[in-house]
Amino acid sequence: MPIVKDTLRATVRVGYDGRVTKQFRGPKAEERFDNEVKVLRHLNARGCPFVPRLLDADAEQLKMVTTNCGSRVEHLDDARLRELFAELEIYGVRHEDVEMRNVTYRQQDGRFCLIDFEFATILPEGK
């Protein structure tokens, strides 16, 4: 399984079946894992169409498996970037890391998607 990202905080691999495996490590790895899993479950339950679907989560290994949301985006207009992250709040989540590195492009449906929710916040209902 090829490594797509290898940092102090996580290793991300994309399998030949298209599934993405993220192994958390480093500072506050357990807390970041728990938060990302919680946020993805929240977004998946609300039918958010532009985030990965959580397929599996192993708390002992701090490893999760998701669907693949496409390839990284190199350039995006600042206004469109802000709009994309603002759209996430309709589903009750603030990303908290509004950066290009957290945007992908899914060619199958021509959709920009968001990834990496380890620092995201679930907003109170009605916000």
Label each residue range with its predicted role.
Residues 14-15, 23, 56, 65-68, ...:
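Conserved hydrophobic "DFG−1" position in protein kinase catalytic cores
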Residues 1-42:
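ATP-binding glycine-rich loop module of kinase domains
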Residues 29-32, 41-84:
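Conserved structural core of kinase catalytic domains
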Residues 25-27, 70, 119:
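Short beta-strand-loop-alpha-helix junction that forms the active-site gateway
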Residues 115-121:
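Activation of the activation-loop gatekeeper triad in protein kinase-fold domains
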